[in-house]
């Protein structure tokens, strides 16, 4: 299972990404005089809160490696759950 602090960090990033997006949209609509203040606000945002730092995690195990976006699971769990037939469209292959 993933550490609670890492899960909280991902939640914080997602929460603040909406704010950052709104600031950028407003920046494009305003005049140049006001955009400088908005640029300062964007630069003052801590790097930990940026969306590029977001790490995809498996919902069940919390594992970050071998993560499949389509299922939001890692490869080990896809194999286990897929063999039982709980994921639609996945079958055990044999040739």
Swiss-Prot record:
This protein's UniProt keywords: Ribonucleoprotein, Ribosomal protein, RNA-binding, rRNA-binding
Gene3D superfamilies: 1.10.287.1480
InterPro entries: Ribosomal_uS14
Example of a GO biological process term: translation
One cellular-component annotation, GO: cytoplasm
One function term, GO molecular function aspect: rRNA binding
Entries under Pfam families matching the protein: Ribosomal_S14
Domain of life: Bacteria
Zinc in keyword set: no
Similarity comment: family membership: Belongs to the universal ribosomal protein uS14 family.
Chain's role: Binds 16S rRNA, required for the assembly of 30S particles and may also be responsible for determining the conformation of the 16S rRNA at the A site.
PANTHER family, per the entry: 30S RIBOSOMAL PROTEIN S14 (PTHR19836), SMALL RIBOSOMAL SUBUNIT PROTEIN US14M (PTHR19836:SF19)
Subunit-structure text: Part of the 30S ribosomal subunit. Contacts proteins S3 and S10.
Descriptive protein name: Small ribosomal subunit protein uS14
Organism: Carsonella ruddii
Organism classification: Bacteria, Pseudomonadati, Pseudomonadota, Gammaproteobacteria, Oceanospirillales
